[in-house]
């Protein structure tokens, strides 16, 4: 009798629990945005000391450490400057730390500056529109303590370029390697695409050009994407080419093109859509489409692709599709013009918090209309914090004296939406 009573009691308890779970309303935790603490590692490249001088400047609003690769870092500081380092400068700091390397090439006729942002190490990177006649070279450094292995892929308008010795390249810790991209390596009379992929570890990589066409350092596009924006194309004479690569070995890519200017955007006549076969690189002259005006190029593709705009005529400069500003970044004041591009359908706002060499603080903000670009002068000294709540705004710094450099600017901030934590006593 007692066993039956206990059994009936247990059944009633279970039935009550099931009924409660069905009848009681389910509460969904509220979602809120939280900022996750992020640390950032940057590598600042250097040039050949026998041909010129390298100067590295790094800034932040918080302390960071910096120093030559495989050497003791500096004491914690918010402002780091060094001349003529013998190895790349490695920086470890907050998500907003940023810096630039300036390499001045001495020339009997005139000095040429190559300026590039310090950037995180990568596992993949692509450059498009690389001319084998311009004295270009892929320069990569293993900035980590463990060894890495990289593969280099080349693409032309007719397909992949088979070059022996470009697979399973060892990248030893602390070692910088240079791979010349010239006619001896690549028999091509048209621009090609260069891609580096790390099958083990990661590397810091740049494309360097020193030749008759000009002088340039260029960061890679770090991953193929379906929505790309190339900002910071300055006004002026000379040729502008849009170079795109579809590295997919089996699927073609269909790409729509939008040219963004200061007063609006448009689809260039005859170039509204570009179709690309698998494993192909292409180069399209967009000089007439831009009309000598400052511009940004927005691409939307049904397959992940990579893209670069190359400027030639008097000097050479290239800028690849870049990530969004991504939170905030603190840049050293190096002058030039800051270009801001907003590809979204809504107005975006960029905040600028400047601090000059005397410590005077200035706060300002600018609104960027949907599908337009906007320019503002960039300070020549001190620091500038750039920040935005937009997830798509791109920023590029254009320096045109003594030579042309285009610097894509992005931060390392992360904001993510997560459910608010809730107490669940039933889980123990």
Please identify what each model-predicted range represents.
Residues 39-43, 57, 140-161, 198-199, ...:
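Short acidic, flexible loop segments centered on an aromatic residue
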Residues 59-62:
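Intrinsically disordered, low-complexity "prion-like" regions in eukaryotic RNA/RNP-associated proteins
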Residues 84-113, 136-148, 153, 174-213, ...:
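Hydrophobic, ordered structural segments
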Residues 2-57, 101-141, 202-248, 304-346, ...:
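Conserved functional hotspot residues at active sites or interaction interfaces
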Residues 68-88, 159-193, 265-292, 357-382:
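Intrinsically disordered, low-complexity Pro/Gly/Ser/Thr-rich segments with frequent PxxP/GP/PP motifs
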Residues 135, 147-151, 191, 239, ...:
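Exposed beta-strand and adjacent loop surfaces of beta-rich binding modules
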Residues 221-293, 298-303:
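Long, internal scaffold/assembly segments composed of regular secondary structure
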Residues 5-25, 194-196, 255, 297-299, ...:
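Hydrophobic alpha-helical membrane segments, chiefly transmembrane helices and signal peptide h-regions
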């Amino acid at each position: 009798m007692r066993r039956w009573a206990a059994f009936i009691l247990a059944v009633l308890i279970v039935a009550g629990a099931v009924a409660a779970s069905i009848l009681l309303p389910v509460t969904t935790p509220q979602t809120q945005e939280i900022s996750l603490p992020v640390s950032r590692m940057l590598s600042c490249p250097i040039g050949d000391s026998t041909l010129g001088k390298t100067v590295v400047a790094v800034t932040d609003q918080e302390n960071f450490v910096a120093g030559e690769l495989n050497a003791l870092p500096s004491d914690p500081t918010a402002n780091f400057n060094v001349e003529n380092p013998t190895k790349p400068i490695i920086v470890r700091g907050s998500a907003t730390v940023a810096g630039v390397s300036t390499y001045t090439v001495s020339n009997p006729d005139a000095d040429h500056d190559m300026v590039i942002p310090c950037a995180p190490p990568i596992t993949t990177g692509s450059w498009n529109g690389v001319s084998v006649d311009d004295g270009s070279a892929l320069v990569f450094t293993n900035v980590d303590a463990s060894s890495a292995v990289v593969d280099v892929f080349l693409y032309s308008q007719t397909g992949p370029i088979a070059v022996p010795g470009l697979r399973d390249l060892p990248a030893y810790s602390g070692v910088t390697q240079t791979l010349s991209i010239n006619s001896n390596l690549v028999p091509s009379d048209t621009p090609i695409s260069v891609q580096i992929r790390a099958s083990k570890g990661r590397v810091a990589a740049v494309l360097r050009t020193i030749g008759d066409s000009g002088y340039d350092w260029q960061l890679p596009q770090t991953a193929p994407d379906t929505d790309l924006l190339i900002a910071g194309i300055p006004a002026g004479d000379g040729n502008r080419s849009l170079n795109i690569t579809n590295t997919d070995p089996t699927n073609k890519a269909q790409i729509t093109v939008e040219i963004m200017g200061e007063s609006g955007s448009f689809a260039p006549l005859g170039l509204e859509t570009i179709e690309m076969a698998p494993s192909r690189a292409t180069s399209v002259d967009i000089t007439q489409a831009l009309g000598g005006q400052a511009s940004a190029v927005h691409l939307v593709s049904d397959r992940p692709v990579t893209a670069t705009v190359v400027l030639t005529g008097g000097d050479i400069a290239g800028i690849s599709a870049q990530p969004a500003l991504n939170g905030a970044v603190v840049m050293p004041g190096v002058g030039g013009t800051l270009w801001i591009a907003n590809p979204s359908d809504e107005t975006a706002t960029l905040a600028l918090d400047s601090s000059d060499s005397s410590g005077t603080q200035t706060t300002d903000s600018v609104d960027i209309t949907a599908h337009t670009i906007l320019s503002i002068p960039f300070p020549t000294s001190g620091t500038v914090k750039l920040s935005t709540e937009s997830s798509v705004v791109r920023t590029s710094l254009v320096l045109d004296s003594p030579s042309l450099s285009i610097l894509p600017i992005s931060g390392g901030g992360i904001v993510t939406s997560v459910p608010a934590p809730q107490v669940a006593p039933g889980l123990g």
